[in-house]
Every structure is written in structure tokens, then in C-alpha cells.
Amino acid sequence: YNNRQISEENFMKQMEYLETCNTDWFDILCRNSVSQSHNLSITGGSQKVTYNASFGYSSSHGTQKGDDMTQFNARLNVNAQLLESLSVNFNLSNSFTDRKGYGPGVSPETYAKQTSRAIPFVDENGDRVFYKQYYEYKLNRTGQLEYGYNILNEMENSYSKNKAKNVNMSLNVNWNIVTWLQYQFVGSIAFNLNNSESFAGEKTSYIELNYRGYAYGSESSGSAKFKAALLPFGGELATNETNNTSYN
């Protein structure tokens, strides 16, 4: 308005809209946390052999929309008195955890805490609002640039995943050979696998700010900005896998 780029009437209309906007970011980005857990146990056997098996399932949906976790676990214990002087105990446990979250730089709860309620989520037509911020992209040297940011656009075009698998086995053997001689074996082995993945798609502001320097789809192949972009197409995928085996 000060630069006479919009009329006073339009300026006052926009001011009135912002004053009454009162966007509830927590309602848009957060939810009530819900979790559930189920367990099944089986016990049986005979005079010489007994066993106990259990199976479990749990899931939780965090207070931030898109923060979800699922876990499965199982356990087996077997005790066997093979001879009066020989006993064996075997234990096996296994768990699998799958967690889903957000891509780099995305935190719905932090955004809800720090963002003004005067910023609208959608415009008068119901379309998402991408509010303007400024940055400089070091590779194209075009000075200050403008980009549009919408938190749901970031959430829909980026993600993180983490999967963990754990298997543990142990075996105990006791053998009373004679009254003055006893043999005992204690052994265990554990397998741990962790796989994490983080992705930011080409439509996110994260890619525009760090790798491209212009809005998605705004530059044609061969333009100066297109040539200067570190990543003119696609997004960023980061993976990490840890595999560990231990025994004693």
C-alpha cells in the first residue's frame, strides 16, 4: 500500500481479513494421541517339557498428525528336563518396529507454536495459502529471492521412516555328570537391524532453498537459474542402515 501497488480499499479489506483470520494451527496440525496394545500368551507342555509363548502388537499415533508407530513382538521359552541329570532352557525373542515421521526441517508442533494465527491456512476460495518469505541462493547470485511456504505442502511431499528388527536367542544347558562334576553351557546371540530413510521431494521449499534456487516448475530447461541449480529435477533421499550381530 505504501508503494501504491494496491488501492486503499483493497488494503483495508486485506487488513480486516487478517484481523479476523485467527487460524488454529494446533487444530490443523495436531490431534489427540491414541495408542493401543494387544497381547496373547500360550502356556503348555508335559512333565518333562514346558513352554511359554507370547505375541504382542501395539500402535500409537502421536499428537502431531503423521507421527505414527507400529510394533510387533514375540517370545518363546522352552524348558526341558531331558534326563534326571540333564536340563535345557531355550529363549527366543523377536521385535519389529516401524515408525513414520517427517522430512528434513518439518516439525508440525513447533510450527504451530511459532506461527502467527493471523496467517491464513486457506484463502477465500478454499485454496492453500503459500505465504512469502525471502532467501538468497548462493549458486545463481541473483540477490534476494522470494518463495512460498505451506506446512502441509512440506508434510505431504517429504517423510522419514525408521524400521528396526531385533532377534535374541539364548541357550542354557546343565548336566550333572557325577556328584562331583558338573558341566554348564550358557550362550546367546543377538541380531539388530536398523534402517532409516529421509526424503524431501522437489515440490518442497527445502529443495528450493538448498538445491534449486527457484520455485518448482517456474524455470524452463536452459535458463540461467535452471543451469545454476544444483538439483533442477527431483528431491533428496538419505538412507542409513546399521546391522549388528553380537554373541557370548
Where are these regions (language model features)?
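C-terminal beta-signal and adjacent terminal beta-strands/loops
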Residues: 27-29
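Transmembrane beta-strand segments that form the barrel wall of outer-membrane beta-barrel proteins
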Residues: 55-61
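Outer-membrane beta-barrel channels and translocator barrels
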Residues: 35, 46-47, 81-83, 176-178
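Surface-exposed loop/interface segments of Gram-negative outer-membrane beta-barrel transport/assembly proteins
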Residues: 1-22, 32, 62-67, 73, ...
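A generic beta-sheet turn/junction motif
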Residues: 44-48, 57
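Periplasmic plug
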Residues: 52-54, 89
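Residues on the lipid-exposed face of transmembrane beta-strands in outer-membrane beta-barrel proteins
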Residues: 40-44, 74-80, 169-175
